[in-house]
């Protein structure tokens, strides 16, 4: 495997099994530093209670070798170049009217994601607000 372990700056919970605490995740090496920057930014800009209430500690996954839901192309998760946050409250087909991550409380989080080379499918297409994936610039070392 070419994946690397990222030690989390704050504990996260599996979104589908909230009693399970995780302290590290597997990611593609090209995005480890930038995702680490994002998570440290979350820790610096939000209190522990805010992180919990906003679901920024609810890990929806990075590496999952599978095709995209309803499609034949491989998911970005197949290469561990994407991460999902709080899938229960930011569901795949929900638009910004329902998804929480579009709310102003998440501005610093979304800003940190963009500043570190991650793309929000919610911001691009108004669905799958939980999902943030590495930009081409980040993947190919053109920036960051």
Annotate the PLM regions:
Residues 39-81:
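Active-site-adjacent loop/helix surface patches within enzyme catalytic domains
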Residues 1-55:
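Active-site acidic/histidine clusters and adjacent loop/turn architecture
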Residues 5, 11, 41, 58-60, ...:
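Alpha-helical structural elements
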Residues 69-144:
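Catalytic cores and adjacent binding grooves of peptidoglycan-active enzymes
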